[in-house]
């Protein structure tokens, strides 16, 4: 069977939910027995989002092979339950840097290097390579931004050319747009969608399907109007209504036969999608009996997208405990030794997620101290683990000036220090310890119990600093347990205090491996402890 290519574009406004639509379609096609992969084209000039502020871009999602990517890849992985690779996120910066590098090496044999064909060929190669490296039947490619953006033009041209390259039967274009409701007029307006499709047609792409994002059901008359003006079949005008839970969306799209229309267009003769297990999960999510309150103490709490995988992993762990997770967003800058009890006292559990830089770290340290002293279940992640070690050094070991060398290079007690292979690194982008690495678990520890007593777990990392092993014996003598280490015993991966209900921190990012139907072990153990604390109140 020829590989099938589905391209998802957006119009009218950004942040319209293209990624969720693409991921939901991917889930439906996977449940039809197809092997699916998915990728995101981001038209910004950055090489990747690794050096971008979370306020600009949200979280950085890390793949198994160490690519720093768009947060939409997290949605893709959670919905479709696949592990993506570096070909799943492509930026303008990445493409141009590769083309320019080839030009400097003389690989274009003296040709004038241009957007067409060199940039578009490079983009098409990324699409085909993503499909080829995963041996996929179907690849879904989402283009970030909206039709009409200057930055998107080479990407859309590459998508247009794909139809001629691989054949019309192997390509489908899906366009997502906003269908606004004007309260004063009491009606929905189709003109923005019509103009968006007109713009797309002007670039040589005729959409085969429209997905309209709307707050209210559009009705068949609106669908017929859009079908007529945009030259798509009426049944191929699909509604994407606002929902209470994101995981309802694949079921809503299936009810409108979206996946069947796609299969018919691409001439895919495959069984209907069996969504029984997914439906049961959604039903459970919508009828959780318990509630648990988690304080998330972070640096970027004004923008929840900066912690989107953390939030989703907490929700998944809640599902496993029949509990709805309510998150209290606490600005780490506001936490002091004087007000910690006031800010954190109502929490059943506390999570200190990752981050970079000095701002907010003292507040996080006070948060960790409060959790340790008051025996509140706590999970520290990445920087959260590093600051857990700093807090213990200061307030248990009596090393008052202890710190991380990242935060204070002159500290006399560098509990956290630069990794040896990072000493001569000058560039910020793409130079961290990235991707999947193993952690050997200590038998009898809470970490081992969280992972069903496995000997080794593999999780994704994104860090430059590590625990300073010169202090390991001193910590262990005071009851601090290093419950996860690298197989060569050099790098600390997980720490815990066994006397507490649940006081565990890890260097890696467990949230990146969580799935709604398969929650991550440490997150599940943490939320379980928080639920137990809640029931004891």
Curated annotation (Swiss-Prot):
Gene Ontology CC entries for this record: cytosol
Domain Glutamine amidotransferase type-1: 293-536
Species: Streptococcus sanguinis (strain SK36)
Subunit (UniProt): Homotetramer.
Residues binding Mg(2+), per UniProt: 72, 142
Catalysed transformations (reactions): UTP + L-glutamine + ATP + H2O = CTP + L-glutamate + ADP + phosphate + 2 H(+); L-glutamine + H2O = L-glutamate + NH4(+); UTP + NH4(+) + ATP = CTP + ADP + phosphate + 2 H(+)
Keywords: ATP-binding, Glutamine amidotransferase, Ligase, Magnesium, Metal-binding, Nucleotide-binding, Pyrimidine biosynthesis
Active-site residues per Swiss-Prot or TrEMBL entry: 382 (nucleophile), 509, 511
Pathway participation: Pyrimidine metabolism; CTP biosynthesis via de novo pathway; CTP from UDP: step 2/2
Amidoligase domain as annotated region, ranges: 1-268
Activity regulation as described: Allosterically activated by GTP, when glutamine is the substrate; GTP has no effect on the reaction when ammonia is the substrate. The allosteric effector GTP functions by stabilizing the protein conformation that binds the tetrahedral intermediate(s) formed during glutamine hydrolysis. Inhibited by the product CTP, via allosteric rather than competitive inhibition.
Residues engaged in binding CTP: 14, 149-151, 189-194, 225
Name of this protein: CTP synthase
Entries under NCBIfam families matching the protein: PRK05380.1, PyrG
Annotated GO MF terms: ATP binding; CTP synthase activity; glutaminase activity; identical protein binding; metal ion binding
Broad EC category: ligase
Matches recorded under HAMAP family: PyrG
Biological processes annotated in GO: 'de novo' CTP biosynthetic process; pyrimidine nucleobase biosynthetic process
Listed PROSITE patterns: GATASE_TYPE_1 (PS51273)
TM annotation in the entry: none
Chain residues that bind L-glutamine: 55, 355, 383-386, 406, 464
Family under the similarity heading: Belongs to the CTP synthase family.
Highest rank taxon of the organism: Bacteria
Sites where the protein binds UTP: 14, 189-194, 225
Record EC number: 6.3.4.2
Function: Catalyzes the ATP-dependent amination of UTP to CTP with either L-glutamine or ammonia as the source of nitrogen. Regulates intracellular CTP levels through interactions with the four ribonucleotide triphosphates.
InterPro entries: Class_I_gatase-like, CTP_synthase, CTP_synthase_N, GATASE, GATase1_CTP_Synthase, P-loop_NTPase
């Amino acid at each position: 069977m020829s590989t099938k290519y589905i391209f998802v574009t957006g119009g009218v406004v950004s942040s319209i939910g293209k990624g969720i639509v693409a991921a939901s379609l991917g889930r439906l096609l996977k449940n039809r027995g197809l092997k699916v992969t998915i990728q995101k084209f981001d038209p910004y000039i950055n090489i990747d989002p690794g050096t971008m502020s979370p306020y600009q871009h949200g979280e950085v999602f890390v793949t198994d092979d160490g690519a720093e990517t768009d947060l939409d890849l997290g949605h893709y992985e959670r919905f479709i339950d696949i592990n993506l690779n570096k070909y799943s996120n492509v930026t303008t910066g990445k493409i141009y840097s590769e083309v320019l590098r080839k030009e400097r090496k003389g690989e274009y044999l003296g040709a004038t290097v241009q957007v067409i064909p060199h940039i578009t060929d490079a983009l098409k190669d990324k699409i085909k390579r993503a499909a080829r490296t995963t041996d996929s039947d179907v690849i879904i490619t989402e283009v970030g931004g909206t039709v009409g953006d200057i930055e998107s033009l080479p990407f859309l041209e590459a998508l247009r050319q794909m139809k001629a390259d691989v054949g019309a039967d192997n390509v489908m274009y899906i366009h997502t747009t906003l269908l606004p409701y004007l309260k004063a007029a009491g009606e929905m307006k189709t003109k923005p969608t019509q103009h968006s499709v007109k713009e797309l047609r002007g670039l040589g792409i005729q959409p085969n399907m429209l997905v309209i994002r709307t707050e209210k059901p559009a009705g068949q008359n609106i669908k017929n109007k859009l079908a007529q003006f945009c030259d798509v079949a009426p049944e191929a005008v699909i509604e994407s209504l606002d929902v209470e839970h994101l995981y309802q969306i694949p079921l809503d799209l299936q009810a409108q036969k979206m996946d069947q229309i796609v299969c018919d267009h691409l001439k895919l003769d495959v069984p209907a999608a069996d969504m029984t297990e997914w439906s049961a999960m959604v039903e459970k999510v919508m009828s959780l009996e318990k509630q648990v309150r988690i304080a998330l103490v972070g640096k970027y709490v004004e923008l929840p997208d900066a912690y989107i995988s953390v939030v989703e992993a907490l929700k998944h762990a809640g599902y496993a405990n029949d509990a709805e997770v309510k998150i209290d967003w606490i600005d780490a800058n506001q936490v002091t030794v004087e007000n910690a009890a006031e800010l954190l006292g109502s929490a059943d559990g506390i999570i200190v997620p990752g981050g970079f830089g000095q701002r907010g770290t003292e507040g996080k340290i006070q948060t960790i101290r409060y959790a340790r002293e008051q025996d509140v279940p706590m999970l520290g992640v990445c920087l959260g683990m590093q600051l857990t070690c700093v807090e213990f050094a200061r307030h248990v070991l009596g090393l008052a000036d202890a710190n991380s060398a990242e935060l204070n290079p002159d500290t006399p007690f560098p509990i956290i220090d630069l990794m040896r292979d990072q000493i001569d690194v000058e560039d910020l982008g793409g130079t961290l310890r990235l991707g999947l690495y193993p952690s050997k678990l200590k038998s009898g520890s809470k970490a081992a119990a969280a992972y069903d007593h496995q000997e080794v777990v593999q999780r994704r990392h994104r860090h430059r600093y590590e625990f300073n092993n010169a202090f390991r014996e001193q910590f262990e003598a005071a009851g601090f347990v290093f419950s996860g280490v690298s197989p060569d015993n050099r790098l600390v991966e997980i720490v815990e205090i066994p006397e507490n209900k649940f006081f565990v921190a890890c260097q890696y990012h467990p949230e990146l491996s969580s799935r709604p139907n398969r929650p991550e072990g440490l997150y599940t153990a943490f939320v379980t402890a928080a639920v137990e604390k809640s029931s004891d109140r």
